[in-house]
Every structure is written in C-alpha cells, then in structure tokens.
Amino acid sequence: MRNQRNFFIAIFAVAILSIRIADSQAQDRAPQDQSWNRRVDGAGDYQTVLEVSGRIEVSRAMKSYDPLDLKSICQAKKDAERRAFLSADGYLSALENSVEANRRQIEIVQLHNELGQIWSYRGDMARAIEHFEAGRKTLAEALRIHPEFSEDLVYLDEILGVSYLRKGELDNCVHNHNAETCIFPLTKQGEHKLTAGSSAAVKYFKQHLSKKPDNLEVRWLLNLAMMTLGAGSAGSRDDRTPIRVPRFTDVATPTGVDQITAAGGAIVEDFDNDGFNDVIISSVDACESLRYFHNNGNGRFTDLTDKAGLADQLGGINCVQTDYNNDGLPDIFVMRGGWEFAMRNSLLRNNGDNTFTDVTEASGLLSGEHRTHSAVWADFDNDGWLDVFIAHEETPSQLFRNRGDGTFEDVTRKAGVGRSAFTKGATWGDYDNDGWADLYVSNYGGENFLYHNKGDGSFAEVGKQLGVTKPLMSFPTWFFDYDNDGWLDLFVASFVPSLTEVARGFMGLPPQAETMKLYRNNQKGGFEDVTAAAGLAKVVPTMGANFGDLDNDGFLDFYLGTGAPSYAALMPNFMFRNREGKSFDDVTTATGTGHLQKGHGVAFADMDNDGDEDLYVNIGGFIPGDRYNKALFANPGNTQNWISIKLTGAKSNRAAIGAKIKLTVVDSKGKESFRYREVTSGGSFGASPLAQHIGLGSSLKDGKIAEIEIQWPVSKTCQSFTNVEANQFIEIKESATDYQLLERRSFALAKPKASANPHANHQPKKSTKRP
C-alpha cells in the first residue's frame, strides 16, 4: 500500500502545532479521529484522495464538551473552528513580521496551507485560494534554500486546482442551482457559465500534470474541469448492452425538498398515516437540525420542522424509522458521532399529530460514551417488540431488548454481539430461513461479523466460517433477495477513499483496491461470493446506499452514494440495474442519477403514488462548507405492473419488520415466476418506506397476482390471498382473512421551470465574514 504524497505540510504540521498548542488547556481536548485515512493489510494498493477540507485542522482545536447537550456540541465545534483560525492566523502574522521570516519560510508555507484549509472548511474558497496562492509563492522563493521541497510545489498546484474547481462549483452549482447541475456526464445545462473557477483549475491541473503526467487523480479532475467548460469526456463506465431504463429528473427544488445542508441520513416514510410519503433528513453539522418535509399530496412538500418540535434536534450523521411502542406511528432514531467523537443519540416518539417527543432518556437509550453511525431495528427474540442494535465506532456495539413498556435493557453481553470494531453499518435478515433475525455488521478497517441467531437470546459469530468477512474497508450493507429464489443474499459496499480507483474504473483498468461484495445465498446455510460474476467487481467509494426497483421488473436494483470529506473527492454516484437476478448493469448515465456531489442517506420510494419508485438522496459533504441541495429524482414511469403492500402486525411487531412476502406471478403465456421480500427499510445508510413496493413485470395473466403469501415471525402463521388485482395499494393485517384496499390518490410532482438560459441570474457569491 502506498502512503499519500510525502508532503511537506504533513512533515511540518506536528512540529509547528506543538509550538502553538502546548498550552495549559491541551489536556482539555476532545479525542480526535484520523479514521478516514486508516488502512489495513489486504485492502489493496491504492492512493487516497488529496485532502482539501480543513477537517483535520479544525478537529485539532476541538476541546471538551457535554456529549449529552446538543447545543453544547454545536458551540464547541464553532469555538474549535474559530480557535483554529485565530491560532494559525496569529502565529503566521507573528512569524511573517519576525526577523526569522526568511529563515522559516517553510513554516510560513505550512501556515498558509493551514489557513487555506480552514477557510475551505467554511466554504470560502476565495480566501482559501488567497492563502494557497501565498503559500505557493513563498515556497517557490524558498526553493533556493530548500530545493528538496521542489516536488511539493507540484502538489500545491493540485490543491489550487481543487480549490478553484470548488469555487466554480459554488458559483455555478450551489448558488445558482438547476436540475442538471453536477449530473455526470454534464449536459449543456450543467456546464458552468461563470467560468473563472474552472478555467483557473485547468491551468493548475495542467501545471501539475506537466511534472506528474501519470497522476490519474489529477487527470480525472482535469477532465471534470474541462467538462464544466464544454469539453472533456464522460469515459466508458456504463455497460454498453442496450437496456431500456428510464431517465430520472431532479425535482427537489420545485417540490420543496432541496434543503441545503451537510451530509446526513434520510428517511422516507408516511409519518402521519395520510397516505403520502414524507421526508426527514439529518445533518452531520452539529448546528443543523433535523428537517421534516410533509408531503402535501399536490406535488409539493411543506417544512414542518418547527411545528414538529425537531428544531432542537441538532446534528445526526444518520437516522432511521422504527415503531418501538407498537402504536402504528413511525418513530425516529437519530445517530450521532460517526467519524467524529462521542455524543448522544436520540429516540423520538411520534405523537400522531406531526409532532415528536424526545424519549431517549426515559427509554434507557441515553448515553454520551459512543460514536455511532448505524443502528438497525428488528425483533430478534420474536416477542412482538422491536429491539435495536446500535453500532459504534471502536467501542463495543450494543444490543438493546425492548421490554414492551417503552424502555430497553442492554443485553449485549448475554447476546454475545459486543465486539469492538470501527463499525459503519449493520443489517438484520433471516438468511437461513429459520424464523429468527440474524445480524450482519460492517466494519471499516477490519473483518466484518455475521451473527447467527440461535433462538435463545444469544448469537454465534459465523462470518469467517461462512466467508463473508470482506471487504475489510466496508461501509453500508444490506440483506436482499436479488435473484428472487426465496433466500436472502448479502451486499456489502467498500469504502476506499480513492479518486484514482474511480478513474481507473472509467478507463477500463483493473482495480487495485477492494471492490464491493455480493454474496449469494447457497440455500444451505452459507454464501457464495458472486461479485465478479454479477459484474460488480468495481471500486466505488460508497457512503449512503439503498436498493429498490427502478423499472418495476421485480428485480431489486441499487444506488450508491459516493465521496469522501475532501473537495477533491468529485465522482458520480452510481445506479446499478438488476438483470433478472443474474448480473448488474451500471446504468448511471442512462438514468441521469450520476450526481457528482457527495451522496449520503438514500431512499427509494413512490413519492407521488403513481406506481413507480422515485429516488431521494441526501446530497452534501462532511464539512460545513460542503453543503449541497438534496436531490429527488422523479421516476418518469414505465408500462410494467406493480403492487404496494403495507403489512400490520398483531402478535408480531406492528411495523411488520422481518415479515416475509412471497408473490406468485403468472404471465400471459402461463409462465410462473416469484417475487420475495422481507420487510425492512433497506440499507444501513438511508431508509425507504416499510410498505413494500414490488414490481411485477410487463405481462400478467388477467392483470392479477396469482397468489400473495405472508409469513409472520411471531405467530408463525402464513396468510394466502389469490387472484389479487395488480397496480394498487393494499394493507394486510396479521391473521386477517382478507386484505384491505387502500385509497391512495396519485398526483404529479412539481417540475423544474423550463428556461432557455438556466444561468440567467448567475452572480458569484462573495463572503467577507471571518470564522
């Protein structure tokens, strides 16, 4: 494995910082995390993306805080940002005005870099560029005395190229957003009209490549910069086999769900049971609250955050729905601290009137001791109440059993699932069809775990035995039956923060790092690695992800949100279409969903009740300056059939999580096929509705589903309904003798306004505010 550039900034950072922060408050600091850059033997030989974000500089200045007080955490992060700036700025001023300035030019260069990084953190790229330019100029002068740093001048060119490209994004994509901005490959509407940023980026990238022509990362970034100017190439990543797939359109802005925030989770669910799917998003920014967008049923959404009592729910790297009290109202669980430092999570009870109450402490789930990125709900002991596995980073993960009275007990030790790892994802699923929910845990920087549920309240770890411990650098994960054989398969995304590996993929070069993994259930209690056979031996640095059926053919497709904290991590998100359970095709370009901005919480859902699944993505980066508009990709529809099934438990948990659905479908020629689903919200970073949307294909005998079978986890009953009309919404209650037709009014999602010149009002935004 290669370390990233042997850059002077890294060489001198520790020495300079030790001078400036060896103060009486040094022991009052929060523990800091360098986990983004961790490596592990066996994960591949790859180059990590150049760091331009300021997150390291600001995190160094973080001091003590109250992990249970969300406002305290917000203030502590603000203070850290200001402290980092004042420290570097003050030291630079003193050094530049000292008699030793000429002798200590390298330190001056490093301090300019540090200030450039801090301004980048805030998103003020004009000021960041001022410091990066000043640092480059000083370094060029210093080479007369320090020729050993000549190569580092080349990497400052890359930093400046990235910074100018980001400035171009801010001027064109963020401040003057339209539905085509940052959709790869860029259309004419997506090209930059304010070209100063990209033009300067091209200059610096070319300067870098004149010295380092083999740097694939910079070649990729140069190509993107050229594309924003109307040149460049889209590469050849999409599979070329002709496939009919719909092209989606981003309608987040006209529908009112395009809130500009940092990275976070996304839940699409009908929170008030009015028949329309609503949206809740979180933000990793400790000063940004949850946002609740209520579906009005007319193509638009209303922001009910304040009314819902969610304005004080600050921060949250991820979120997921549950129904912990079995009242039929979807509750919310918010996870915090992932990639950062320990802080509290939140359990929010749905009151049934579009308001929520924080019951974290009352439920027994309040803690400030952990960093959490993932949590997953299931009834692991089949007592009819949803339990929760909370996956922590580095500290032992926890399993909480629902007592059925609104409180939880920690049964981690008894269950045997408390291993310590840097856990980034988890998913429940009954992979061996024995009626008990099993648990898969995805770890970043180590082997993954598969816990087999023994049915007595304890689990056996069988991951290594069954060969499902990889990727070693993994992130989101899920169980799904991709081949419709009635047995859950396992998908695990890799997270290798390497732009070079993405470029290699587009150039048709073999990967040098870990790829994603698809494990096919062998129906004998184990799995087979079919990644290569399924066409998925690709390196995609995945963060948010989920699965759904984009074309109603009945086979589950999936979407991968990509990125890393650095502004240099510009790569498309990816859509993969399932080819009848045999393999997957990259249909990113064809579907128009290849957003270049960073993809986090992902949900597939029918937002307009028209019988196809749309795609909601929480777009935005990890740092405050990398906020972006969320995306709602509207599905244009197709001629294939579908059914939406809402299950309601009685003896089993009310949300029916873990219940199994089997559809028998007969086409017009008499051929029989099957569809299988297990009720979940999907992947571990993004939550789709619990009501199951199931595609049926284009040809149905008499327009009906031959049979619907439901298997319930607690009562062990199996319901069967025959000759059910397709293309409708139904509800099936546990033990009921018939299903209920649900009235669901369809409507059109608001569309972007047509404009001959989408950039007519372009004006670059300026910032003069200091941190």
Segment roles from a protein language model:
Residues 266, 278-283, 328, 332-337, ...:
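Hydrophobic beta-strand segments that make up the repeating blades of beta-propeller
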Residues 534, 583-598, 603-771:
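Gly/Ser/Thr/Pro-enriched helix-cap/hinge segments flanking short amphipathic alpha-helices
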Residues 263-273, 294, 316-326, 372-382, ...:
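Beta-propeller blade termini
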Residues 77-96, 124-141, 194-202:
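Helix-turn-helix repeat elements of alpha-solenoid scaffolds
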Residues 66, 71, 138-154, 162-207, ...:
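Short coil/linker segments at helix-helix boundaries
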Residues 169-193, 335-340, 493-511, 561-569, ...:
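Short, conserved, GDST-rich strand-edge loop motifs in beta-rich repeat architectures
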Residues 249-262, 283, 302-314, 339, ...:
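Short loop/turn motifs that recur once per blade in beta-propeller domains
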